[in-house]
Amino acid sequence: MVVFVNKLTLIGKPEELERIYAHVAEFMEEQPGLIRYQLLRSQKEPGTYFNVAEWDSNESFDKALAEPEFRARLKALGTVIKGEPHMSDVVVEGVAR
């Protein structure tokens, strides 16, 4: 498993980001290899969001990103956010007892 973490800095309206993100997420939910995702808004800095997505592999993630439909939906995100993407490995994992 790999985790995609993208720090998003808002340059547009929050409502617009959330609407566009939902449109992109609708497509991603159908992609093989996506385990789960979340869009998080910072309590400390409301103009900062984090997109966190778990994938079964880098290959599944890369395949989804290469889809023309994804590229088309992604263009709109660039009008409302500036991203800092990071593909990450899980090094410690836990659950509450």
Annotate each predicted stretch with a short phrase.
Residues E15, T48, S60-D62, A96-R97:
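Intrinsically disordered, low-complexity acidic/polar segments
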Residues L10, E69-A72, G94-R97:
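Short flexible/disordered coil segments
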